[in-house]
Structures are given as structure tokens and as C-alpha cells.
């Protein structure tokens, strides 16, 4: 069961701005390192994500994936060196398996309030320059 997170408020706001209905397929796992979401990892989160997306598309064939929204990084604060390479692989795999090579990817920057996160925040800031069709939502000022 998914808990209520910032995605709900984001979807409400975006829906109001676009004056359209927004559907989210959520596969959040708090406190989880990026590597656990990789294809073929023993946790199976990647496969569960694909299953949920494909199930939603079967139930609503009039819909299509519009973007991947990603907000993660705290659990990679100590293992940040390979973060961008792993994230690039994850996004490429999702795009390939969904058959949408230019599917936008939007990352939310984690909070800057904790100095232990400084290295991973620096890596996350590089996402738009490292992953095609990617953008970043800054946490500056929060």
C-alpha cells in the first residue's frame, strides 16, 4: 500500500494548471537506494513498476505515459559516485520497455538542509545535462 506523499499535492496542482485529469502510477519506496529500482534487482521494484504501468494502461487504453517523476537520493548519500550512471540506465530501461524513447524524466531535488546530502544533491543537479529529455525541480529555498 502506498502512503500519501508529495505526489498527491503535485498532481492536484498540475491538474488545476493544465485543467485536465492527471493519473499517477506510483511505486514509491521510502528509504530505498536507487540500485534497488534497477532492472533485475532482487527487490523486483523495477518489474513491479512496469507491471503497474502496464496494468493501468490495460485498464485505461486511452491513456499514455507522459513523464517519469523521480524524487529519491537520501539513501544514496554515501554511495553517490555511480548515482548518475545507474539513474541513466534505469531511465533508459524504462523508456525502452515502455517503447517511448523520448519519455520525459523529471527529478525532484532532495532537500539541501542536511549537509550529509551535499554530494548527492550535487549529482542530482547534473541530471538535466546527463540524461536526455530530463529536467530538474530545485529544492532551493525550501
Describe each region flagged by the PLM:
Residues 1-142:
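Cell-envelope and extracellular/periplasmic
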